[in-house]
């Protein structure tokens, strides 16, 4: 199997293709990307027959920015007979996947494909039973085995393949299913909530998103991101010249600082989180984030970078490289991840976690 399907936001196929071509090439897994505008997916076709599995095994999925999900596939199955779509699919997967732990029958995130969603849900149950009978799936779901993917691009037309549970998105179609909280000040709250699900393992939430932590929200008005921090019982300094939602102020957990987020400097040294969703040029935001991290003003940060109209992958890569260079120069060891989230539009969300730093002659364990 030499093809890898990458699901992405419709309209960002070129960025997804540029990224996978770049990062696969750096691992000497060469191929070319098949791109269809606004399709919501890209197919990276490797030149060597076994390189598809090698790619999804060796390249960390967490290192990808524009892909929501990925899986290796074989040839396209076309003209599936309406009276029996299951048999050809089972035949394609037998001998390819043995004892998969989960089945996902998926589509691209486009209006055209959404017409297939109802069919996919109904089709999953009988297909799962047939795959279990054939030994392609285990008799029970398990996260320790590969995930089997059946990806419909049109009625009676699908790719079949698999991904590795330890190196994929745990979410169906790569999209966390979140509900907008009715008491949140703005829909932007879903961006930060999704970022927390994507970047922080669930079993680490109690430690890294703990009650009583101190946090800063730069460019906070009206409080969509502050809302997520308050919901997790943090004390929040919300920095913005614009007003905060009264419902947040009434909690007693929010201190509104009427200042410019680019000029604000914290006056305490125990800030766990800094979040930022300001409409500004990516380079300016990245420089500010580097300043916070280099100076140890926070332990973790999540921030958004607004994208230009052209060369968006190059722009993000340049800013992430600058951030990494600044951290390296100042002896800060950190983990950096970036992802275009489902709730992002013309932007990407970046998460940075300081691990430790040598600052002013002392080792600062973080």
UniProtKB/Swiss-Prot annotation:
It is found in: Cytoplasm. SUPFAM superfamilies: S-adenosyl-L-methionine-dependent methyltransferases. It catalyses: cytidine(2498) in 23S rRNA + S-adenosyl-L-methionine = 2'-O-methylcytidine(2498) in 23S rRNA + S-adenosyl-L-homocysteine + H(+). Keywords: Cytoplasm, Methyltransferase, rRNA processing, S-adenosyl-L-methionine, Transferase. S-adenosyl-L-methionine binds at residues 188, 221-224, 240, 260, 277. Its main location: cytoplasm. It comes from the Bacteria. Coiled coil: none annotated. One of its GO terms (biological process) is methylation. Belongs to the class I-like SAM-binding methyltransferase superfamily. RNA methyltransferase RlmE family. RlmM subfamily. PANTHER family: RIBOSOMAL RNA LARGE SUBUNIT METHYLTRANSFERASE M, RIBOSOMAL RNA METHYLTRANSFERASE FTSJ DOMAIN-CONTAINING PROTEIN. Monomer. This is Ribosomal RNA large subunit methyltransferase M. The lineage of its organism: Bacteria, Pseudomonadati, Pseudomonadota, Gammaproteobacteria, Enterobacterales.
């Amino acid at each position: 199997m030499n093809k890898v399907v990458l699901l992405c936001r419709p309209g960002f196929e070129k960025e997804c293709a540029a990224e996978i071509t770049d990062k696969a090439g750096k691992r000497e897994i060469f191929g070319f990307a098949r791109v269809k505008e606004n399709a919501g997916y890209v197919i990276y076709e490797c030149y060597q027959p076994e390189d598809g599995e090698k790619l999804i095994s060796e390249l960390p999925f967490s290192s990808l920015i524009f892909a929501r999900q990925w899986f290796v596939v074989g040839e396209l199955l076309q003209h599936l007979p309406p009276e029996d779509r299951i048999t050809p699919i089972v035949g394609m997967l037998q001998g390819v996947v043995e004892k998969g732990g989960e089945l996902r029958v998926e589509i691209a995130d486009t209006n055209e494909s959404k017409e297939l969603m109802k069919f996919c849900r109904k089709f999953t149950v009988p297909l799962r039973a047939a795959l279990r009978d054939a030994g392609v799936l285990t008799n029970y779901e398990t996260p320790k085995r590969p995930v089997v993917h059946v990806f419909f691009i049109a009625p009676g037309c699908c790719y079949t393949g698999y991904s590795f549970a330890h190196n994929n998105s745990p979410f169906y179609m790569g999209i966390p299913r979140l509900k907008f909280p009715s008491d949140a000040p703005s829909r932007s709250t879903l961006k930060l909530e999704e970022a927390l699900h994507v970047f922080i393992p669930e079993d680490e939430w109690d430690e890294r998103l703990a009650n009583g932590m101190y946090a800063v929200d730069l460019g906070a008005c009206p409080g969509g991101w502050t809302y997520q921090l308050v919901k997790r019982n943090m004390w929040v300094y919300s920095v913005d010249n614009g007003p905060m939602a009264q419902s947040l102020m009434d909690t007693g957990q929010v201190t509104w600082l009427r200042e410019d987020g680019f000029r604000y400097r914290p006056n305490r040294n125990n800030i766990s989180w800094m979040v930022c969703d300001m409409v500004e040029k990516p380079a300016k935001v990245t420089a500010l984030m580097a300043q916070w991290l280099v100076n140890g003003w926070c332990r973790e940060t999540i921030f958004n970078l607004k994208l230009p109209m052209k060369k968006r992958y190059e722009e993000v890569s340049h800013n992430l490289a600058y951030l990494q260079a600044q951290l390296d120069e100042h002896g800060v060891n950190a983990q950096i991840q970036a992802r275009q989230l489902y709730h992002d539009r013309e932007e990407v969300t970046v998460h940075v976690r300081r691990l430790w730093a040598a600052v002013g002659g002392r080792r600062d364990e973080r």
